[in-house]
Curated annotation (Swiss-Prot):
Domain U-box: 403-476
Species whose genome carries this gene: Gallus gallus
Biological process according to GO: protein ubiquitination
PANTHER family assigned: WD REPEAT, SAM AND U-BOX DOMAIN-CONTAINING PROTEIN 1
Entry protein name: WD repeat, SAM and U-box domain-containing protein 1
CDD domains assigned to the protein according to its UniProt record, in alphabetical order: RING-Ubox_WDSUB1-like, SAM_WDSUB1, WD40
One of the record's GO molecular function terms: ubiquitin-protein transferase activity
UniProt signal peptide: none
SUPFAM superfamilies assigned: Quinoprotein alcohol dehydrogenase-like, RING/U-box, SAM/Pointed domain
Domain SAM, first and last residues per copy: 333-396
Gene3D superfamilies assigned to the protein according to its UniProt record, in alphabetical order: Transcription Factor, Ets-1, YVTN repeat-like/Quinoprotein amine dehydrogenase, Zinc/RING finger domain, C3HC4 (zinc finger)
Length: 476
C-alpha cells in the first residue's frame, strides 16, 4: 500500500527532479531554485532554497555520503553545494556552454558526470572539482545517465533513442537503439542478478522513453569485456510518454512517471504492477525512492512534490537482507547492503558516515566499541544501540538458513513450489498462483510481460520430483 503523507508546494514552476540522501530530499525546478527538506518532518532547511543558477534547473543529485549536492541548468553550469550549510563549493562550466540536462555522482564520489543538450558528456574529478575527460554521443541531446555500482562504467541516454555504455576513460563500449522516439531516463539497480549466463557482474537497468515504454535490460560490467546490454522485457503500463524511472534501493521495485499523469510501481522480478498513483494533475517528471525504500517522492509539472509512504509489507531493503530465501551472511554484505540494514534498524542518519568510511559487511560485524569511539566518533547512546544490533547480527550468522534453489521458487510468489506447472511462456509457476494470475484477466507472462499464446498449464512432474528430492536431503 502507498499512502500520500505530504505534498510540497514551494516551487513556483514545473518540478524537474527530486533526489534523496539518507536524511534529506532535494527538489529542483524551472523556477531556477533547488529546495532541501528534512526527512524527519519534510520541513524546508534554513538555508533553502539554493539560488545560483540563472535559468531552469533540470537535475539534482546527492553524493553517496550526502555531504554534497550537484545541480545542473540551462545556464550551462553544474553547481556543487555543501549540504550542511548550503554553500556553493564549485561551479563547473560545460566546456561547450550548452545547457546541462543531467548530472550524476559515481558510487564512490570519484567522478561527477554532466550531460548536455549538444550531446557532450563530461567527467569531472570530484576531489579536485576539475575537468577530467569528455566525449560526445553521435546524435541528439544527452538526457539520462546512470553509473554502474562499481563506478567504473556509466550509461547515457539520448534524445535520439540510444543507450551508450562508457568506461571511466570515456571510451564508448557499446551502443544500443533502445527507444524509437528518444530516451528520457535510465537507472541501474545496485543489486546483482543472474542473466542465466553470468554468475557475477550482471545488474538490471531500466530505461524509458517517448514511445510510452519502459525497457528492462541485463547489463554486464567486466573489465575484460567492457559493458554489454541485453534486453530482458518491456513494461507497457503507461498510455503516454514515460519521463522518469527509478529502482528502489534494494532493487525489488521500479517506479515510473508519465505524461499520462500517473505513477506506476512495479515489482522488478515479475513486472507486476503493485500500485498506480494518479494524484498529480499534470505530467509526472520525476520520481525517487528514499534509501530505505519507505518513502517515495514524485514531482510534476503541477509544481508539486508528493511524498508517499510505502507499506512495510512491500519489498524493503532491510527485510530483503534478512529474510530473502537467498540469504547471505552479514559479513558478505556490500556497502549498499549495510546502508539498507542501517535504514531498516532506524539508523538512517548513519548511512553517510558508514559510506564515507567504506564499511561493508565484513567491517560491520567486526566493529568494536573502540573503533566506534576513535574512528567513527560516535556518541555513547548511538554506540550502545549499534553494538546491540551488531551483536544480534553475529548471533544470526551462527545459523544461517539453507538457501532454496531459485528454480524451485515460484516467480510470482517467490515461495517454494508444491504443484509446479509450465505455462505457455515456457516458465514454471505454482499452479494456484498462475491460476489466480489468469483469473484476474491477466493475459501476459509474469516473467516477460509478453502476451501468453495460450492459457494451458501443464504439470511439471520433473520439477516436482526434483523439489521432493531436495526437501528429503534437507530433512536428513
Amino acid at each position: 500500500m502507498a499512502t500520500l503523507i505530504h505534498t510540497l508546494t514551494d516551487h513556483s514552476d514545473d518540478v524537474n527532479c527530486c533526489a534523496f540522501s539518507s536524511s534529506c530530499l532535494a527538489t529542483c525546478s524551472l523556477d531556477k531554485t533547488i529546495r532541501i527538506y528534512s526527512l524527519n518532518d519534510f520541513t524546508e532547511l534554513p538555508y533553502s532554497p539554493l539560488k545560483g543558477h540563472t535559468y531552469a534547473v533540470h537535475c539534482c543529485c546527492f553524493s553517496p555520503s550526502g555531504h554534497t549536492l550537484a545541480s545542473c541548468s540551462t545556464d550551462g553550469a553544474t553547481i556543487i553545494w555543501d549540504t550542511s550549510d548550503g554553500r556553493m563549493l564549485a561551479v563547473l562550466e560545460q566546456p561547450t556552454g550548452s545547457p546541462v540536462r543531467v548530472c550524476r555522482f559515481s558510487p564512490e564520489s570519484t567522478y561527477l558526470v554532466s550531460g548536455a543538450a549538444d550531446g557532450s558528456v563530461v567527467l569531472w574529478n570530484v576531489h579536485s572539482m576539475k575537468f577530467y575527460r569528455s566525449g560526445n554521443v553521435k546524435d541528439g541531446s544527452l538526457v539520462a545517465c546512470a553509473f554502474s555500482p562499481g563506478g567504473n562504467f556509466f550509461v547515457t541516454g539520448s534524445s535520439c533513442g540510444d543507450l551508450t555504455v562508457w568506461d571511466d576513460k570515456m571510451r564508448c563500449l557499446c551502443n544500443e537503439k533502445a527507444h524509437d522516439l528518444g530516451v528520457t531516463c535510465c537507472d541501474i539497480s545496485s543489486h546483482p542478478v543472474s542473466d542465466g549466463e553470468h554468475a557475477s557482474g550482471c545488474f538490471q537497468m531500466a530505461s524509458c522513453g517517448q514511445d510510452n515504454k519502459i525497457k528492462v535490460w541485463f547489463i554486464l560490467f567486466a573489465d575484460f569485456l567492457g559493458g554489454e546490454l541485453r534486453y530482458k522485457c518491456t513494461l507497457s503500463g503507461h498510455s503516454a510518454p514515460v519521463l522518469t524511472c527509478a529502482f528502489s534501493y534494494d532493487g525489488q521495485m521500479l517506479v515510473s512517471g508519465s505524461v499520462d499523469k500517473c505513477v506506476i510501481i512495479y515489482e522488478t522480478n515479475t513486472g507486476n504492477i503493485l500500485h498506480t498513483l494518479s494524484q498529480h494533475t499534470r505530467y509526472v517528471t520525476t520520481c525517487a525512492f528514499a534509501p530505505c525504500s519507505l518513502f517515495l517522492a514524485t514531482g510534476s509539472m503541477d509544481k508539486t512534490v508528493h511524498i508517499w509512504k510505502l507499506d512495510n509489507k512491500q519489498p524493503c531493503a532491510g527485510n530483503t537482507i534478512e529474510n530473502d530465501s537467498k540469504i547471505r551472511t552479514a559479513e558478505n554484505w556490500s556497502e549498499d547492503d549495510v546502508s539498507a540494514w542501517l535504514c531498516a534498524q532506524g539508523f538512517a542518519e548513519l548511512v553517510g558516515l558508514f559510506k564515507a568510511n567504506n564499511i561493508d559487511g565484513k567491517e560491520l560485524v567486526n566493529l568494536t566499541r573502540e573503533s566506534l569511539i576513535h574512528e567513527l566518533k560516535m556518541s555513547l547512546w548511538l554506540r550502545s544501540k549499534i553494538l546491540q544490533k551488531i551483536e544480534e547480527l553475529r548471533m544470526k550468522m551462527v545459523s544461517v538458513p539453507v538457501a532454496v534453489p531459485d528454480e524451485f521458487l515460484c516467480p510470482i510468489t517467490r515461495e517454494l513450489m508444491k504443484d509446479p506447472v509450465i505455462a505457455a511462456d515456457g516458465y514454471s509457476y505454482e499452479k494456484e498462483a498462475m491460476e489466480n494470475w489468469i483469473s484476474n484477466n491477466r493475459r501476459s507472462s509474469p516473467m516477460t510481460n509478453l502476451p501468453l499464446p495460450s492459457l494451458v498449464l501443464t504439470p511439471n512432474r520433473t520439477l516436482k520430483m526434483a523439489i521432493s528430492r531436495w526437501l528429503e536431503t534437507q530433512q536428513k
